[in-house]
Swiss-Prot record:
It comes from the Eukaryota. This is Neuronal acetylcholine receptor subunit alpha-10. Expressed in the outer hair cells of the cochlea and the neurons of dorsal root ganglia. The lineage of its organism: Eukaryota, Metazoa, Chordata, Craniata, Vertebrata. The heterooligomeric receptor composed of CHRNA9 and CHRNA10 has an atypical pharmacological profile, binding several non-nicotinic ligands including strychnine (a glycine receptor antagonist) and atropine (a muscarinic acetylcholine receptor antagonist). InterPro entries: Neur_chan_lig-bd, Neur_chan_lig-bd_sf, Neur_channel, Neuro-gated_channel_TM_sf, Neuro_actylchol_rec, Neurotrans-gated_channel_TM, Neurotransmitter_ion_chnl_CS, Nicotinic_acetylcholine_rcpt. It is found in: Synaptic cell membrane; Cell membrane. The record marks H31 as: Involved in the interaction with the conotoxin GeXXA. It is a multi-pass membrane protein. One of its GO terms (cellular component) is postsynaptic specialization membrane. Component of neuronal acetylcholine receptors (nAChRs) that function as pentameric, ligand-gated cation channels with high calcium permeability among other activities. nAChRs are excitatory neurotrasnmitter receptors formed by a collection of nAChR subunits known to mediate synaptic transmission in the nervous system and the neuromuscular junction. Each nAchR subunit confers differential attributes to channel properties, including activation, deactivation and desensitization kinetics, pH sensitivity, cation permeability, and binding to allosteric modulators. Forms heteropentamers with CHRNA9. The keyword Transmembrane applies. It comes from Rattus norvegicus.
Amino acid sequence: MGTRSHYLDLGFLLLLFLPAECLGAEGRLAHKLFRDLFANYTSALRPVADTDQTLNVTLEVTLSQIIDMDERNQVLTLYLWIRQEWTDAYLHWDPKAYGDLDAIRIPSRLVWRPDIVLYNKADTQPPASASTNVVVRHDGAVRWDAPAITRSSCRVDVSAFPFDAQRCGLTFGSWTHGGHQLDVRPRGTSASLADFVENVEWRVLGMPARRRVLTYGCCSEPYPDVTFTLLLRRRAAAYVCNLLLPCVFISLLAPLAFHLPADSGEKVSLGVTVLLALTVFQLILAESMPPAESVPLIGKYYMATMTMVTFSTALTILIMNLHYCGPNAHPVPAWARVLLLGHLAKGLCVRERGEPCGQSKPLESAPSLQPPPASPAGPCHEPRCLCHQEALLHHIASIASTFRSHRAAQRRHEDWKRLARVMDRFFLGIFFCMALVMSLIVLVQAL
């Protein structure tokens, strides 16, 4: 331990009494290299030995964060790290002549930089170059790493909202140099997602790169560019919980109006209340959706549900009118008696009180309302008691006829009420199946 402390003290004394010239040798060599490199250097011209030579630029993009996705204005804001690499023919040296100095870092404004810009930028601000350093190696290789906040146009397709996926392209290319002067190529087949910060609304599926060579109407020479396509899928959990599931529950509640007794007086009120609730959710959905030509999937579901509730409410009103048909109403038509009160009532297990399920009551013919035969005309020649019996029988027959008429009217009223119950049971099954199928179709899209 004492020997180690002795060597440390000796090293400290040597550093203390060394001349400053020895300590700054590397710094002096870097200054000398800088002066030698930039003595006759200009950043205004392409750094190529031959003007006919094409300068190759390699472009690499790292996605760091999705700042904003403005669906209404269709603008995507990203935070990127952009790396550009090229070879400068005038920035090379022999490392042995400069103390094995292999690379230097200098401000990027001092060297020539490719005028690569984002073609589909969505703001009016002029492109600004980041004031970061470039790394220059002894063989002339230049690497420029710069952060950038980009605002690019992105066509948003909301036809499958909230289960939609978007494709947003970022196209980079030279603004003034054609393909014969500057050729840009991507490094690798896709952008890097190693340092990506997860977004709460969007899930990134990838960011493949593709090189294109296009010819524009203004110029005859080709212009190469590199397009990075950002593949996004919306995280739909919040929309499912806040917009979709309430609509599903409400749509399943609407057919239950057919199960309410007609005498409760709440059948129509339930349908109107459900329709108002769907209207409120439709307004909330419209506020969160961008204006578009195509109707989103959830919007179609809302419209289909509102249409179903409207028809169910209208049918409920019709069924209530049938239920409250009075004794003076016409009899149930023969076809309705056979099809609805016969076969359909048996299939739906709608029966009268005391009638077992599955056995329909035989249809009775209307009772005969013929008056009793009149007594022969002329004076009564029978004994007095017989005349009183005939008068009593005549009054009893009249009372029986009135009772039979009242009973027939009551039976007509009961037939209409039974017909209303059959239609209630039938439309309950139909509309509940419709609501269930529509809800399953939408929910399957989330899987």
